[in-house]
């Protein structure tokens, strides 16, 4: 059961997820809304396409750090891996469906990666190895990336996380795969 402090943390995590690095950077540097540029997605990939590698890196890092902050603080305050995974889900929902942008946010990959590294760097390293294998097979980033992300629940089981934590990780994967289905 979630107590009131945890509930408030989840709400704060969702709202923190509403901070979209791509939006802030393009407003600050170019006085435009990235949601009206390129693919219209306020994420690292669109930033890279429209403004170049530097903007991709800044956006990726900003959104990844956002996920890592939420996960790290949840771990510090509550110490329960199931709750930490729930906090990661909350920040992802805030990033993907931000209330301040009428539900039109990013696709969550950068935030997920940052949160996952903070959650368990060994799982993150395992998934990097899986990605490299699939990258060598498919010679691209999108398909190997999505296949790798789908391997998270298997890693959760291999690294002995609870069934509830593993199910939450599977829900996160379903969300990310749904948002990235195009």
Swiss-Prot record:
Chemical reaction(s) catalysed: an acyl phosphate + sn-glycerol 3-phosphate = a 1-acyl-sn-glycero-3-phosphate + phosphate
Pathway(s) per entry: Lipid metabolism; phospholipid metabolism
Compartment(s): Cell membrane
Cellular component per GO, a single term: plasma membrane
Record has Hydrolase as a keyword: no
TM region(s), chain numbering: 5-25, 54-74, 81-101, 117-137, 157-177
HAMAP family, per the entry: PlsY
Role of this protein: Catalyzes the transfer of an acyl group from acyl-phosphate (acyl-PO(4)) to glycerol-3-phosphate (G3P) to form lysophosphatidic acid (LPA). This enzyme utilizes acyl-phosphate as fatty acyl donor, but not acyl-CoA or acyl-ACP.
Protein's name according to its UniProt entry: Glycerol-3-phosphate acyltransferase 1
Organism: Bacillus cereus (strain ATCC 10987 / NRS 248)
